[in-house]
């Protein structure tokens, strides 16, 4: 990964990000871009609803002045990665391996085109099948249930009653040390066999699931004016993953293209990052689809206007005459600028329609989950959007 071209490109992006102006006007609905204040608001909503995400301040020398000192970026740790990307690759051979599934009962009406689910990879066999496991043999029953000769020779009813003199006293039993007896050590019972390192390594990966974990980070990109996603991975022994190992968990369509190794601006470490050049356009499409699914926005109710007009209409004739005669400077300014009390009250009661900006990072995580499907990034599936 020591490519000089990538190093030059990273330096160019760092300078470009430094010289880019900070977005001050919200472009959330128009272009899918957000301001640093909106990024903090969306991060507060994410940490409140899903506490696995936490704010981090990072290194003080690398802090961004347009963000609060204690809210520089978001992080969630120990996110599991159960499979490699090759286990979920979708190739051309899998295009025909699809099937529509319907979960409606027979008593319900016929399903529509939107009521079916698509099941993919239906012809792909799993790597480990339960039927491939060897069966545990049952313990065979004893061939005979007859008592042994020793047990057959015993007769409980035959023996007389023991007398008290025949019971030995425990103090009369001689000690082993007094008799000169020595304990015999059984070599077979105390022998400990240590397996070799090769045997341990060969059996470690047979029946155990090798789980990798990742630290997922969301920062704010000043140039693209969108969030940016970062990954730092560990193996099953909590050792940091190499860049080659990280890209084993990234689909081939995105490895070294959409996702590359970049310098994390808050620490300088080399982390895998999803390039944010397309984030704004993709988020704009998601927001438009969600708002279209919610239906048309409700019209404003003219209660304030009607109540105001009713109040003004109920005034006496004397007050109306005084208002007509009264043409002061304040009245002229309010009349020209349109500033009046009913309009101010209407702005306060204005209902915000559509998707709020607080949901931005929740939608963003669902978009990232489609890029790295092997990593359990999205923990917000129970949220009703």
From Swiss-Prot:
Pfam family, one: Autophagy_act_C
Ranges for region Disordered: 126-169, 292-329
Region (Handle region): 281-359
Source organism of this protein record: Cryptococcus neoformans var. neoformans serotype D (strain JEC21 / ATCC MYA-565)
Family, per entry: Belongs to the ATG3 family.
Region named Flexible region: 88-208
Record's subcellular location: Cytoplasm
Record's GO cellular component terms: cytosol; phagophore assembly site
GO molecular function: Atg8-family conjugating enzyme activity
This protein's name: Autophagy-related protein 3
A biological-process GO annotation: protein transport
Active site per UniProt: 277 (glycyl thioester intermediate)
Low complexity bias spans: 303-312
Keywords of this entry: Autophagy, Cytoplasm, Protein transport, Transport, Ubl conjugation pathway
Chief localisation class: cytoplasm
PANTHER family membership: UBIQUITIN-LIKE-CONJUGATING ENZYME ATG3 (PTHR12866:SF2)
TM region(s), chain numbering: none
Quaternary structure and partners: Monomer. Interacts with ATG8 through an intermediate thioester bond through the C-terminal Gly of ATG8. Also interacts with the 40 amino acid C-terminal region of the E1-like ATG7 enzyme. Also interacts with the ATG12-ATG5 conjugate.
Cytoplasm recorded as keyword: yes
Taxonomic lineage from the root: Eukaryota, Fungi, Dikarya, Basidiomycota, Agaricomycotina
Record's function text: E2 conjugating enzyme required for the cytoplasm to vacuole transport (Cvt) and autophagy. Required for selective autophagic degradation of the nucleus (nucleophagy) as well as for mitophagy which contributes to regulate mitochondrial quantity and quality by eliminating the mitochondria to a basal level to fulfill cellular energy requirements and preventing excess ROS production. Responsible for the E2-like covalent binding of phosphatidylethanolamine to the C-terminal Gly of ATG8.
Comment text on domains: The N-terminal region is involved in phosphatidylethanolamine-binding and is required for ATG8-PE conjugation. The flexible region (FR) is required for ATG7-binding.
């Amino acid at each position: 990964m020591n490519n000089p071209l990538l190093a030059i490109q990273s330096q160019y992006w760092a300078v470009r990000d430094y010289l880019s102006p900070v977005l001050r006007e919200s472009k959330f609905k128009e272009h899918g871009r957000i301001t640093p204040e909106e990024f903090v608001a969306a991060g507060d909503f994410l940490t409140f609803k899903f506490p696995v995400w936490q704010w981090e301040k990072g290194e003080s020398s690398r802090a961004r002045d347009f963000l609060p000192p204690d809210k520089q970026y978001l992080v969630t740790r120990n996110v599991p990665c159960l499979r490699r990307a090759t286990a979920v690759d979708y190739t051309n051979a899998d295009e025909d391996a699809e099937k529509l599934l319907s979960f409606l009962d027979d008593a319900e009406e016929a399903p529509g085109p939107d009521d079916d689910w698509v099941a993919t990879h239906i012809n792909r066999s799993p790597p480990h099948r339960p039927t491939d496991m060897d069966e545990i043999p049952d313990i065979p029953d004893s061939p005979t249930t007859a008592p042994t000769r020793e047990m057959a020779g015993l007769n409980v009813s035959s023996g007389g009653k023991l007398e008290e003199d025949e019971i030995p006293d425990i103090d009369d039993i001689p000690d082993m040390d007094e008799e000169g007896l020595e304990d015999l050590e059984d070599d077979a019972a105390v022998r400990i066999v240590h397996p070799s390192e090769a045997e341990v390594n060969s059996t470690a990966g047979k029946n155990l699931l090798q789980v990798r974990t990742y630290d997922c980070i969301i920062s704010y990109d000043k140039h693209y004016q969108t969030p940016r996603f970062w990954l730092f991975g560990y193996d099953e022994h909590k050792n940091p993953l190499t860049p080659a190992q990280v890209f084993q968990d990234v689909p081939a369509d995105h490895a070294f293209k959409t996702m590359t190794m970049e310098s994390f601006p808050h620490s300088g470490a080399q982390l895998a990052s999803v390039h944010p050049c397309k984030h704004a356009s993709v988020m704009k499409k998601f927001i438009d689809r969600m708002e279209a699914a919610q239906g048309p926005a409700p019209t404003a109710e003219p209660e304030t206007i009607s109540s105001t007009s009713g109040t003004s209409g109920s005034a006496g004739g004397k007050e109306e005459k005084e208002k007509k005669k009264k043409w002061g400077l304040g009245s002229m300014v309010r009349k020209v600028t349109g500033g009046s009390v009913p309009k101010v009250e209407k702005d306060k009661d204005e209902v915000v329609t559509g998707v709020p900006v607080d949901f931005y990072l929740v939608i963003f995580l669902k978009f990232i989950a489609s890029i790295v499907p092997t990593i359990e990034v999205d923990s917000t599936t129970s949220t009703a959007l």
